[in-house]
From Swiss-Prot:
The lineage of its organism: Bacteria, Bacillati, Bacillota, Bacilli, Lactobacillales. Its main location: cytoplasm. One of its GO terms (biological process) is heme biosynthetic process. It is found in: Cytoplasm. It comes from Streptococcus pneumoniae serotype 4 (strain ATCC BAA-334 / TIGR4). Disulfide bonds: none annotated. Its EC number is 4.99.1.9. This is Coproporphyrin III ferrochelatase. GO terms for cellular component: cytoplasm. It is an enzyme of class 4 (lyase). InterPro entries: Ferrochelatase (IPR001015), Ferrochelatase_AS (IPR019772), Ferrochelatase_C (IPR033644), Ferrochelatase_N (IPR033659).
Amino acid sequence: MKKAILMMTFGSPEEIIFEGVADFFTNIRRGVRPQDHEIQTLYDNYVRIGGTPLQKITRQEVALVEARLGSEYSVYFANKFSSPFIPDVIGQMEADGIEQCICLILEPHYSFYSVMGYEKFLESKQIQFLVIKDWYQEEALLNYWADEIAKILKEEVKQDSFKVIFSAHSVPIFALDFGDPYIDQIFENSKLVAEKLGLSSEQYTNTWQSESDIGIPWIKPDVLEYLREQTEHPDHYIFVPISFISEHIEVLFDNDVECYDLCQEFGVNYHRPPMPNTDSRLIDALVNTVRVNENQEFKEFLPEEETFDELVPSDETKNILAESQDLQMPEFVKKLIEKKGRENVKMPYLIKKMLEKAGKLPKE
């Protein structure tokens, strides 16, 4: 039986030109082109950081994992929102005669909001899939973060005051209200690293970053808001974007530009440990994740059964809708409905109710 590993990541623009960024942004918005001023802002951010190394780094990670696993598995690489797209790579896997595939998403934590977006593309009449849900507890990855933070504390901070700020990509608040495990996983991940470093609860905190402006509430505190709200600052802030493993715009701009600029404004030293990228400790974590999971059951994947629409909303979610009269329906969702029709659009409960409230959908 021919087996494969499919390593997947978010993707990035294929060219750092306006239309290249527009194409990528349109894919993120499910085929609805954002407004030009939104595209311009994202394009300017990419230009500010000199482009993105994400695709190069990810391909190197894939090659290193493949070399470690040997001939036992064929290793493939796909993106969610840029080429090579997941459905195209699955088509190539079918042509290569693959029958079983372990899906390794290059995001250590599991979220309905993000990881489920990969799962919906896993369709094949030939291939059975095994999706690794999360791998943030891998000891090699925990040691990586602890070791790199320890270097900063020893070589840069020394005896000065400091705070370690663990940050993770934010998710809409409705994901939490559906029982999304992501938030608890981030807190646990941060605590595990902090314990390895011997940090007290006063020496570290959790924040969120990189939320999208789509008119719905996100998990707080946002890292920039957190910095602005502090009445006193330590000598050093150490930013640890723990939900990511590779350098890309949400680290190189959101942390290294926006957080750095605020630190400059407040007279605080900015630090960020290097991302794992192709470090051997990350490769150890990825390979061990495969080994730990490879004997689990493979199955024909049914992504239509793995959507938000299948999840039962909590009373808390309904209360958010009732109490948030100022919620605005995301513009891209309105455009998507108009373009594809309601019957062809899967959406979370909260957004569905927002559409009904706006008179765009018949009430259930």
